[in-house]
Amino acid sequence: MRSKASSRLLATALLVTSLTVVTPLAPVSASTTDAAFNSGTGALNVNYAGYLSKHDIVYNRINTNALHGLTVGNGRTGAMVWGQNGMTMQVSGVDLAQQSAYAAGLLNFTTSPAMDSSFSTFQQRLSLYDGVLTTKYDSNRTVTIMGSPNSEVMGIHVDDTRGGVSSVSVNLNMWDPNSVQNVADVPNLTTWRTVSTFANANAAGFSRGQSDPNNFGYTFAATVEGAGFTTQVVNGTQVRLNITPTSSYTIWFTAASRINSPGLNSVTQAQNQLNSVKSTGYATTLNNYKNWWHNFWARSFVQYSGVSGDADYMENVYYLSTFMIAAGGYGNYPLHFINGVFRATQDQTKWSNGYWYWNQRDVYNSFLASNHVDLLAGFNRLYSRNFNALRAYTQTRYGTDSLWVPETMGWDGNARGTINSDYVNDLYSTGTEAAYNMYLQYRYTNDLTYLRDVAYPYMREALRFYQNRLQLIDGKWQMVSSNSHETYWDVRNAITDLAAVRLLAPLTIQVSTQLGLDNGLRAGWQNLVDNLWPYQVGNGAYLPHDPPVSQTRNNENVALELVWPYDRTGIGYPDYQTAVNTWNVRPHPYGNVWSNDHAHAARLGLGNQTLDGMRTMLQKYQNYPNGMTNNTNGVFEYLGIHLTALNEALMQSYNDKIRVFPAVPSDSSFVGKFTLLAKDGFLVSSEREAGEVKYVGIRSQYGNQARVVNPWGTQQIQVRRTSDNAIITTVSANEVTFATGANTVYVVERTAKPLTNYTATTLTGTPNNGQKSLRNTASILGLNAGGGGGSSVVALRAHANGRYVQAANAGAAPLIASVTAIGPWEEFDMIDLGNGNIALRARVNNMYVCADNAGTNPLIANRTAIGGWETFALIRNSDGSVSLRAQANGRYVVAENAGAAALIANRTAIGPWEKFDLIPR
């Protein structure tokens, strides 16, 4: 989950961006008398182009902050784009390096005169439906960034009808290769610090990692279609394409991975890829690329709207998160939870040099329900392809012919990140999670071959590992010592181990019987189930291990693993109240960027808490207008777990029962609609408005038996086959079970108000054209046209004690309200950053004031540039005073201890100590 140096994790738990006051999203028009279900297709009628356009991310001013760059990718290669010296992007690829740790390089596109000179209108739009990033300057300049599907190639198409353009150039460059650190556990760091360039009549580029013993490495190269060009090597880390100005042309670029190249020759592969896409041409490639994304979106649908716009924002983040993960999720290796394919930090990564299962499951597990099992399959392949290596290492480490899976694993199954870490070196339950995800892949695809050849062997060997580790004491199988995930070390009967066995053993027995394999092993497995040590309960809630509670080492809510992803309890289970109690008293509410409290709330049917949890996570961690985070502990986890929470709020099938709208808000304005995939291949659709569920539509893909929880309690319902309107069954019960035919559509409806009572409709939306905000938080998506408005010189007088704030010790010490007169140490440049945000620069040392360590340390003037920690929302109070809210953590600045202590951003509300007079100088 995270590095051994966990102290920094807690320091960054609260990270929020600047306050922006924007009108909340308006709910999508809805009607309680219509329905969008298509009885022929078995899905909702959706105008996807129109509907998804309302979730486009729009920048109405040029963004020069690399960390706020918009993201575009084709599944294997991604680019993060911002405006700097023209248009700049950092290009990354999934398969370029171990754990995607090293990026490809920077691409800079410039013209003379500049593309962004002399314009009156500007808009940059990320179209989620098309997967295209379009930048328009007036009506005579458009830059379209897109990709070639199922390849590593992306393109920049330029339409520029201005006269007088004298030059156009594209630079591919690499940052200082000597700055590269071994963040990927590579065996040869020198080859990653070695750059080789080339330039010929057809393309130019450079390569790194060409001698990597693990066969990673890449070539970053570009060519041009539709215009003449020359190429040159500028220096040892930079190449350039000089393009003859014309009104329309396309720049193609690729990050060709060595490991996927014939003969490991990424230079030849890059040139072949560029020649191929150039031969296909821009128009055809763009059409193919759009169709690839259109087909992706057509596989599922969610609407989660209303509640004063809060739910709409959750829905926007849902689609944006889905896009960002999918845009890098189709490589040979999984999208890494930190590195991914979208970053603007060169080769700098955060803290992990491996795949951490907890974090990766956050990213991937939602894609079963959203009908993108192929994405989860890529995650599963990382573990299944290393099956033999992991078994061999299990024999070496534990002396048993079975399967232990390290929580922190390298691309090749190595456990170097696990065995030397106290957090994970005695963590045993990861193998069960990996095996269970493979089993679920079977349950959602009906792929019996995959079950027999891949999933079942994994299940069997992971269970046999537990047989080897458990000890029979006083007639009960017990785990004498292991980690209860990362939070409790070397404890007795970790709840994760007990849950793992209770999950895996019955399933393995069932599959063994189904396949007719390993009959002689089943009795031993059943003995585990029958005699396993019970979970421990204290004060009505599950304990993470046998008492007494061990020292807390991390901020996971381990006991709730029973709820998700171990699927051991939930709505309708005998221990439901115990599970709810466990959620209510969990020790670390939303404690980190990978927290899954809201997914647990959804599984427990806590609808209001689920919405509040999604909102809380975004308030804390969605800090940038592109949807990304400034959290130092992760990147993609909070996006992926948001998807899980929202899917589980709308539909659940984990316990082989289809349950619709189990955890939606109680607010009557909430509107929910979806088409999602349930276990056993049922495509489920339903709509809920004004508190009423209209119907449940089911398309059976494989002809399995369906079991549906009656969403109307025990009102009489019927199951109707839509092809001939035959009534399959009628019941007045809280569940209905019925046989289905493959590729056949059914409707579960009230006999008193069947689906035919509703008029048909198609869901659509209106294109977004501006910035969106999450009500009463600093989280925004997109940028308004307004910008900063200069600076002024001010002093601050604290209401707490009537004294002036000074940058003490000439700025070397924290800010404190301690002096009675204004001098050089008390003067600050107040810089208007736009959207109600400011920065303060101390005149005494010309340094910016920082809410240091994400706001956990006092304010101090010691930064040379403005970032998130140096940004404050300026709040003007009704009495004429002002307050400052730190972007770093969303807390108000206080003159602590009535001004006797340093200023610090740690208050959640404004009182006298949080007020200051702004004194112009």
Segments from the language model and where they lie:
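Sec-dependent signal peptide cleavage junction
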Residues: 20-32
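Lectin-like carbohydrate-binding module/patch detector with strong preference for beta-trefoil
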Residues: 787-921
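Catalytic cores of secreted or luminal carbohydrate-active enzymes
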Residues: 101-110, 636-685, 689
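Carbohydrate-binding surface patches
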Residues: 149-160, 680-707
